[in-house]
Amino acid sequence: MNVKVENIEKNVVKLEITVDSEKFNEAVKKSFKKNAKRFNVPGFRKGKAPLNIIKKYYGEGVLFEDAINFCCEDTYPKAIEENNIKPVDYPQIDVVQIGEGKDFIYTAEVTTVPEVKLGEYKGVEVKKVSYEVEDEAVENELKSMQEKNARVSLKEEGEIEKGNIAIIDFKGYVDGKAFEGGEAKDYEIEIGSGTFIGDFEDQLVGLKKDESKEVNVSFPEEYGREDLNGKPATFEVTIKDIKVKELPALDDEFAKEVSEFDTLEELKSDIKDRMKKELSEKAKAEYEEAVVEAVGANAEIEIPKVMIEKEIENMVRDLEMRLKYQGLDLKSYYEFTNSSEEKVKEYMRETAEKRVKTDLIMQEIAKVEDIKATEEELKEKAMEVAKQYGQKDVEKTAELIANAQKAYLEIDIVNGKVLDLLVESSKEIA
C-alpha cells in the first residue's frame, strides 16, 4: 500500500491510496466468493460457474463493487493511522484506477479534527456566583404543599368564585365552525389558575350550577396552531358542578401530617436547607460554565461545518428519544410548537457549536496536561452508570457497559478531570 497526502483546504485532506494488483485480485476473489450464488450462467447450475466464466459472461467489473469495499475497509484505517490523520466524518471515496491486472488506486477526501490554539486556561478570572434563599420562596413552597393537601368538596349552593373549581362542558368555535381539540366534557378548571386563554376563567365567575354562557376570547398570536393563532373564538360553556377548596392551616399539625417533623418551624427549616443545597449546586454549575466560557474565549478554533451538523443530528436524536418516553414523536412536536425540522435544527445550531468547541478545548487541554482515565476510574464510572439502569446484576451490567461504551466513559472521566483543573486554578472575583 502506498499513500500520498494532500491538504485540500483547512481541515480537509485528500489521501491517494494505491493497492497493488495482487491485493486487489484477492479482493476480487473474495467478492466472487460472497456473490457466487446470485450468478446464473447458461450451462452451469446457479452459483456454480467458475470465476473466469463469470468475468467473461458478466464483464470483469461485476465483482468490483464489493472488491472496492473490501480494499477500502482494509487500507483506509491503516492509511489514516500511519499518517496521524484524525477524521471527523466518513470519507468521500473516488476511484482513480481499477481493472484486472492493475493496481487499484482511489482517493479518500475527509474532514479532520481542527487545530486548537489554546490561550490562557489556568487562572482565568470569573465572577463569583451565589444565591440566597428568600423567605418568600420558603413561603411559596409551603403554599404549594397546602394546595396539594387541600380538601375539595362540592359547593351545593352559590356562584363560582375565584379559587373555586368548575366542572364544565364546553365547545369552541372559530369563524363559526367547531375546531379540533375545542370540545370537552366534565373538564375541571380552577378559576384564576390561568389554565385557559385570555379571560376565559374570569367570565365564568358569578355563574351557578347548570347555567350556560357564551364566552368570547381570542387566541394568542403565537398559540402554536396556524388555524387558531390570533383568532377570536366563541365557547359554549355549561357549568356541571362547582367545587370549593379548603386549605389546611399552616401549623404544627400540618407539619406532622405532611412530613417527618413535629413543628412548622422544623418543616420550614428543612425546606430552607433543601433550597440552600439546590441553589449551591446551581451556583456551582453556573460558575463551572462561566470558567469554561472564559477558557473558550481565549482559544482559537475554526470548527468544520460537518462537526456542527453532526452534533445537531445528535441533539435531534436526543430530542426524539425524550419525546418517545412521553408518547410523542417529532412530527407531533413540530405541529404542537408550530415549528419544523429546519427551524428546530437552526435553533440548536448555536448550542451545537458551543458543545463542539468545548469538547475540542477539553480534549486539547487533556492532551497538553497528559490527563487520562485509569482502569479503576473506568470501572467506577461503569458501575455508576449501571446502578442507574436498576438491573439486579449490577456488576454484570457494569462490565457490559465498560466494554460497549469505553470511549464515552473515557471522555466523560477526562472531561471531568479537566473541568476540575480549570475550576481549581480559576480566580473568583466579586
From Swiss-Prot:
It is found in: Cytoplasm. Its main location: cytoplasm. GO terms for molecular function: peptidyl-prolyl cis-trans isomerase activity; protein folding chaperone; ribosome binding. GO terms for cellular component: cytoplasm. Residues 163-248 form the PPIase FKBP-type domain. The keyword Chaperone applies. Its EC number is 5.2.1.8. Consists of 3 domains; the N-terminus binds the ribosome, the middle domain has PPIase activity, while the C-terminus has intrinsic chaperone activity on its own. Belongs to the FKBP-type PPIase family. Tig subfamily. This is Trigger factor. The gene is tig.
